[in-house]
């Protein structure tokens, strides 16, 4: 019998995003959060994800000052932040909170123009560690934050992402509030423009 031709190669299964675990930032996970920040140069030069909080960054901002302020918020329970884990390693986060908890958004003057209703919740800073980008970390964080908001009673949620279509690719620091298309995946809609490339996007969660 003549040799049969070998069967065609089986196509490789499509790549899927890793299965992440999410946990809230609190006293029990502070060291995991701090390790991620330290591994990424304090995050954008030492922000420590304090920029949206009432204290903000300011002229006297330093990594030491910002770390201390963030730790105080964690101890006092005045922070809402989802940490994303790959195994036992914290690889990113998604910050959220009320306008009172996160009052310092970007472009505040433009934001107040045409404001008709304050949101119940804001999504602030989104961060992914440098070795884990483009693997769905931000998506997992936003999903977990929205689940937490739903569990807390829902309401009107705002995000302040950057438009990515129609412009040159941007480095991560410019996308610290997330890209617009990420929030479109979760049903957010444009409300109004507050900067050349930044939009207020909204979604109501029942």
What are these regions (language model features)?
Residues 72, 76, 85, 89-129, ...:
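Conserved acyl-donor/pantetheine-binding loop and adjacent beta-alpha core of acyl/acetyltransferases
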Residues 47-80:
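Active-site rim helix/loop that mediates acceptor-substrate recognition in acyltransferases
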Residues 88, 163-164, 197:
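Conserved beta-strand edge residues that scaffold enzyme active sites
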Residues 123-128, 134-151:
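Conserved acetyl-CoA-binding loop-helix of GNAT-fold acetyltransferases
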């Amino acid at each position: 019998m003549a040799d049969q031709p070998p069967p065609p190669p089986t196509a490789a299964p499509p790549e899927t995003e890793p299965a992440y675990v999410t946990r809230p930032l609190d006293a029990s996970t502070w060291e995991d959060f701090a390790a991620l920040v330290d591994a990424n140069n304090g995050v954008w030069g030492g922000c420590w994800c304090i920029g949206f909080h009432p204290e903000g960054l300011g002229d006297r901002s330093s990594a030491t000052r910002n770390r201390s302020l963030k730790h105080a918020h964690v101890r006092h329970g005045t922070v809402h932040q989802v940490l994303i884990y790959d195994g036992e390693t914290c690889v990113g986060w998604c910050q959220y909170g009320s306008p009172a908890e996160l009052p310092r958004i970007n472009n505040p003057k433009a934001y107040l123009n045409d404001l008709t209703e304050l949101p119940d919740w804001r999504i602030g800073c989104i961060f992914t560690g440098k070795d884990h980008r483009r693997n769905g970390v931000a998506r997992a964080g936003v999903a977990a934050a929205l689940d937490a908001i739903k569990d807390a009673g829902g309401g009107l949620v705002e995000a302040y992402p950057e438009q990515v279509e129609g412009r040159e690719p941007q480095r991560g620091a410019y996308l610290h509030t997330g890209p617009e298309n990420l929030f479109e995946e979760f049903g957010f809609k444009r409300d109004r423009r507050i900067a050349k490339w930044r939009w207020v996007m909204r979604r109501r969660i029942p």
